[in-house]
Amino acid sequence: MTQAELAKATGLSSGGTFSKLLENLYESGVIRKYPRYGAERVETVYQLVDFFSLFYLRFVSDVQCRSGMWHAMDRTGKFYNWAGETFELLCVLHLPQIQKALRIYSVDDSYCWNGRDDEGNGAQIDMVLECDAARTDYLCEIKFSESRFMISTDFNMNLRNKLSVFQRSGQHKKTHSLQIALISSFGLAKDAHSDVVNHSVSLDDLFEQ
């Protein structure tokens, strides 16, 4: 969320005191801030990165604990939303390992992108890695799964749309080629649509020494 969005959500004034509060949380490692491209101007986005706080706010805060509560929540929509958010955060915090898995020697810029092309078609990309040396932009799609990730017909079309929209946007460096990287828990399942992905990265890659 942006500073203005956070201020609105909390009911606090988005002034100097609020800015100082965000800076203290950033310096302590509780949140991170990063640029979000795609809008008319670059926005600074703040994200909670403390894993315990993410769990506490989702499952403990304002919830009366009772026997069997966690078992009842397992594999519910609430559980999968939390798992998806924390897996995406895990990937963001392991950028050097992702870079190694993709065999990228240097990353000149990394960011999330949410924008439109000149025709007004929109798309959101979890993470873009720009590599000037290889003249390549890696469009990273991050997906939590409990087995090898299988690409459906709809998801295949969604990935191709993201590639097309980003390619036609002002963010894309026209001298760079584009490649799609899927970062998932257990890797990519080979099927009729798996060829849309150029690179597959798994949890094993994130924790490789």
Language-model features, listed with the residues they occupy:
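Long, low-complexity, charge-rich intrinsically disordered regions
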Residues: 133, 141-142, 161-162, 168, ...
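Short conserved micro-motifs at the rims of enzyme active sites and ligand-binding pockets
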Residues: 58-60, 139, 151, 192-195
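Acidic, metal/cofactor-coordinating or nucleic-acid-engaging core segments within structured domains
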Residues: 93, 97, 103, 161-172
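Accessory nucleic acid-recognition modules appended to NTPase machines
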Residues: 1-125
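Mg2+/Mn2+-dependent nuclease catalytic core
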Residues: 145-165
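Flexible, glycine-rich phosphate/dinucleotide-binding loops
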Residues: 40, 55, 136, 189, ...
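Conserved catalytic cores of phosphodiester-cleaving nucleases, focusing on short active-site segments
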Residues: 95, 123-146, 159, 180
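Domain-level recognition of nuclease-like catalytic cores that cleave nucleotide substrates
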Residues: 171-209
